[in-house]
Amino acid sequence: KQKFEECQRLLLDIPLQTPHKLVDTGRAAKLIQRAEEMKSGLKDFKTFLTNDQTKVSDEESKDSRAGATTAADVSGAPNTETTGPTLEWDNYDLREDALDDSVSSSSVHASPLASSPVRKNLFRFGESTTGFNFSFKSALSPSKSPGKLNQSGASVGTDEDSDVTQEEERDGQHFEPVVPLPDLVEVSSGEENEQVVFSHRAKLYRYDKDAGQWKERGIGDIKILQNYENKQVRIVMRRDQVLKLCANHRITPDMTLQNMKGTERVWVWTACDFADGERKIEHLAVRFKLQDVADSFKKIFDEAKVAQEKDFLITPHVARSATPRESPCGKMAVAVLEETTRERTDLSQGDDAADTTSEVGGVSGTPEPTTKAVVSPPKFVFGSESVKSIFSSEKSKPFAFGNSSATGSLFGFSFNTPLKNNSSEASSAAQSGSERKVEPGGRQESQNSDLKSASDGKVKNTSPAFLKEQFSTSHTFKTPEKVEERKKPEDLPSDDDVLIVYELTPTPEQRALASRLQLPPTFFCYKNRPDYISEEEEDDEDFDTAVKKLNGKLYLDDSETCRLSEENVTDNEKECVIVWEKKPTVEELAKADTLKLPPTFFCGICSDTDEDNGNAEDFQSELQKVQEAQKSQDENIASSADGMCTDDTKVTVPFLCKSEEPEFTTKSVSSPSVSSGTVDKPVDLSTRKENDADSTSQVESKTVTFGFGSGPGLSFADLASSNSGDFAFGSKDKNFQWANTGAAVFGAQSTSKVGEDEDGSDEEVVHNEDIHFEPIVSLPEVEVKSGEEDEEILFKERAKLYRWDREASQWKDRGVGDIKILWHTVKNYFRILMRRDQVFKVCANHVITKTMELKPLNVSNNALVWTASDYADGEAKVEQLAVRFKTKEMADCFKKKFEECQQNLLKPQKGQDSLTAEFSKETNPVVFFDICADDEPLGRITMELFSNIVPKTAENFRALCTGEKGFGFKSSIFHRVIPDFVCQGGDITKHDGTGGRSIYGDKFEDENFDVKHTGPGLLSMANRGQDTNNSQFFITLKKAERLDFKHVVFGFVKDGMDTVKKIESFGSPKGSVSRRIIITECGQI
C-alpha cells in the first residue's frame, strides 16, 4: 500500500512535455483529473510491486548493480534490451532505492553505485536545481498503453489498458474510439500450410483476346507452392507493395510450358486462374530477367506435375532466393539504425571488457548479458530519459564533447555543468576524458584518451585544460576529431572491411604551396588529372611553327618586348617588313607636342582610309597621279584654313576617300588670329589642290592653338565655360551645308573606282532584286489533281461548317473554308464540296439529291441545315450538317443555287415505258440469261443494253455474255439478293462479291449518270466506289434514287421480269440466298 501511494504521487508530479509553457490552474486541474483516471492502470503496478517474487528479483538486481556499473544506470533504462519499445513510464524508478537521498561520488558518466543510489527527483516549477544539463538522445516512439516494468526496469509493451495514452505528449484533446479495435490482428495469407518450392521476381502478362495483344498483369515474386498435406502444387504471384493477386491457379498434369517466339526467357501457358476470385481461363506469360532463372522455373514446373502424380514433396529451389528489393529508407538511415542498436547493446560491454586498466566512474565490474532488439528510428522527444537529464537535481557531469554517456546518445555530445572533484578516481577519470573514434561503418567506440593503445602506456594529453587536478567553473570543450587527426596512421586500429583502392596524394610542390596558402594539402591535386589543361600554359607550338615558315612570329618571346618603341625597330629586321610608313610633318608634330598628344595623332585624318592599304600600287605613285589630275581642274576654288592637315594628309580623292559620303573627321579647326576674314565657306577636300597658294592655308606651326588660347592645361570644361553660344571652333556660317546633302546614304554606287582590280576586290556586293539562281538539277513539274477538273463551280463563298454530334448532342466545328456547289458537265450531277483553309482537307463531299431539304437554323438567320450521306472521310456516313455564312445575303444565294440544282434533277422523270421509248434503239445489242435454281430451271431474262448512252459499259457486258474474250457470265451465280431492292451477280472470279473482271482489265471508270434508277428492271454496274467497275452488275427490283450518281445504268430488262421475281423470292434482307441461282447459259440475240 505504501509503495502504491508513492507511485501515485510520482504520477501526479509528471512534468509537462513542453516545459516552455507555464502551467495554469485549468491545466493543473486536468492533470489531476487524468491522474484519477489512471488509477485503473496502476492496479497492474500494484500487483507487480506487491509480488514477492518481484521483490526478490529487485534485491538480486541491486546486488548485480553493486558489482558492475553499466551505461543504462544513468537513465534508469535497463542494461538488457527487450523487444518492447522504450516508454516515458520507464524513466521513473519505482523501487525503494530510488527514493534514497544519499548521493555518491559520480564519475564522468555519473553512474550511481548500488551502495549509494542517487535519488532521481523530477523537475518541478518553482524549485531551484543545483545544475542544468541538456543532451540529445535517440528517443523512441511511445506505445499506445503504458507497459509493465520487468525486474531490471525495462519496459515491456502489453495489450492491456490500451485506452490509456500519454496525454502529456500532446496539447490536444483526447478522443475515445467509438468502436474499440483489438491491438493485434492476425494476418493470414493462405500460404501458411504450403512450402515455397520456387520464388523469384518476374513480370507477368496475360493475352487480351479482344485487343489481340499481350497486356501487363503485374510485377512481383512468382512462387510455386506445394501443400504439405495433399501435395497439391499451385502458382501464386502478388504485385509489389499492394500484394494484390495477379496469378493463382493449380498446376495440372495437362499444362505445358512453351517458349514465346523471339525470346527464351519467357514461358507461356494456359490455366484456369482464380486471381480475380472467379474461375477464368487465362493465357499467361511470365518473363524473367536471366535465362538460368527461367530454366529453373521450367524445371520446377515439370517436377511439380510429377510430384502431384506420385504424391511426394518437392525439394525447394534454394539456388536463388527472391530478388532483394531496396529498402524504402536509404543506406544512411540503415547505418544509423544499426549504430543505435549496436550502441545500446554493445557499448557498455565493450567499454568494460576491452579496457581493464582504466576505470569508468571509478568502478569496474562484469556487465550483465545483453540481447539484441529492434530499435525504432531515432528522433528527439521531450520526455523519457530527456526529462530526467534536463530537469534533474543530481550532481552534474563535466562538460565534454564526445563523452560516451550511457544513454547511447546518437549525436555524441552533451552540455553539462562542471563538477567538483570529490574523489581521486573521479579526478583521474575526468582528467583523462574519453575519446570517440568513428569507424568507417559508422560505429563509435569509446577509448581512453590517455592511452595510445592497449599495450602502450605512454600518456598523451589532448587538452591543456585537462592537466589541472581541480576543475574550474568554466566549461571545457574537447574535440575528439582533432585528437584523432594527431594520431599517427599506424596507431589507429586496422579495419579489414575497408579496402583502399585509390588515394589522392599531392606532389611536394603542391603540398608546400597549399601549406603556404593555408589550404588543405590536396587542394591542388586537380592539376594531376590527365584531362587537366592549364590556362596559363601556352599551347601555340603548331601556330608558331606555321608562322615562322612565313617569316613571321605569332607571339613575342618576352612580354617586355611588346612595348618596343619606334627607334628600336630597324629596317633590317628579318621578321618585320615595313611596306609603307606615314610620318608626321613638322606642323603635325608641333601640334601634337603642343596639345600633349602622340606624334602621329594628326597623321591620316583626311585621307588615310582602309582602301589606301588595299591598293596594290604604291602610295606615292598614286598620289602623284591624283595631283596631276587635279591640276586640270579649276584653280579658283576657295578653301578655308585647315591647321590640322598637311600636304600629305589633306589630299582626298575619289579613289582614296569616298567623295560621296561626308568625312566627319575633316572639321576645320583654326585660331581666330589665323582665320580668314573673307572666306567662310567650308573646304571641299575632294576638289582642293595640294599646292594651294592661299595665305589662309599657310599657318605657322608655333602659333597653332586648340580652341581659345588654350595652353598646356586645356580641358573641355574650360571650352564649355568660355562658349557663348556660337561655334567653339571659329565662326558659324549661315550658308553652311555638308557636301552631298540629300544624297542616298545606302545607295548603290554608280561609278566604279579607277584602277581597281576586278579580281581582288573586297567591296561589299550590293543587293539586287533581279538576281536569278538557276537550279543545279531541274525537277519536273508535278501536276496536282484535285478531282474538280471536269466540274464547273456554280457557287463559292467562305463559310464555317458544323456537324451534329449525336453522342454529345451538340454542334461541333467541321472546318472553315470555301464551300462550293460543283456541276459535272459530263456525268451531269451536282455535289457540295468544302475544303479547310491551308491544309485543304475535305470536310464536306456529297451529291445533291432531290430529297434534300435546306432549313434555316433556329438561332441564326445566316445558317442552313441539311442531312446527307457524306464522303468526307472516304466512306459514306449520314451526317447532319450546318453551314454559317457571314451575311444573310450569302446564305440566301447558297439556298437559291441549291434549289436550282434540285430543280434540274426534278425534271419530269419518265417511267419504264418512256425510258424504253427514249433510250431504246434498234441498233442497241440484246443479250439473254438462262437461270437455274439448284438445277431447277427458272426461265430466261432478255436485256437491252444502252450502247448509245454508255457504249463502253454496254460493250463490256455484251462481251461477257458472249464469252468471246475467253471468260464470261456463264456458270456464274447471283450471290446477293435483297427483296424490294436488287439482285446482284456477275462475280466471275470468286463468286462471293469480292472478285470480278472486265474486258478492259481489272476495273474501268464510270461513263455517266444520265439514266437514273427510276424503277424496277434496270441494269446497273456494281462497284466499290468511284471508277471501280468490273463484271459485277445488279437488277433493280424497285425505284432506288439513292443509287443515282453512284452506279451507271447501262440497260433494262426487256423481257423476263417474272424470272426476276422468282430470283427475288430466294433472297433475304441481309442478302444471303437460300438456293444456288446459276446462269446456265448466256449470249447475244
From Swiss-Prot:
Ranges where the record places region Interaction with sumoylated RANGAP1: 497-501
Molecular function GO labels: cyclosporin A binding; peptidyl-prolyl cis-trans isomerase activity; RNA binding; transferase activity
Stored Pfam families: IR1-M, Pro_isomerase, Ran_BP1
Pathway field: Protein modification; protein sumoylation
Modified residues (Phosphothreonine): T18, T158, T479, T609
Domain PPIase cyclophilin-type positions: 928-1084
Cross-link Glycyl lysine isopeptide (Lys-Gly) (interchain with G-Cter in SUMO2), sequence positions: K388, K460, K478, K658, K681
Residue stretches making up the RanBD1 domain: 174-310, 772-907
Region (Interaction with BICD2) location: 12-152
UniProt modified residues of type Phosphotyrosine: Y532
Name of this protein: E3 SUMO-protein ligase RanBP2
Gene expressing this chain: RANBP2
